[in-house]
Amino acid sequence: MRSDTENWIALAEYDLDTAQHMLVTGRYLYVIFMSHLALEKMLKAHVTEVTQAIPAKSHDLIYLVKKAGLDVPQPHLDFIGKINTASIPTRYPEDLQRALKEYSESVAREYISQTAEVLQWLKRMLMSGE
């Protein structure tokens, strides 16, 4: 495995840990943001391994899935699409109070749980060479 791939994996795990800290402190919008970043970086690890090059500077998770040539199970793909859509409104909310209501603690917990599940699957695929 390439050293830059290993770095992407470490960054993804660091970002998931940061999302967990944001959950504890009640910063739920940042849970979504950091969860998205964790998935983005793990997908970039896949792209790095497949292309043997530094991945494009993209935040689009669906693009990265395609670029990596991954056959993602449908429930994981559905979540990737969902968090991909949530990324911009949680990063740049037009109405902070509305965003805080929409992305409540329970929503943040669900996002972080699903992120951890998808990250685990992505890492397993990387380690197995699939």
Could you describe each region identified by the protein language model?
Residues M1-E130:
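Terminal alpha-helical segments
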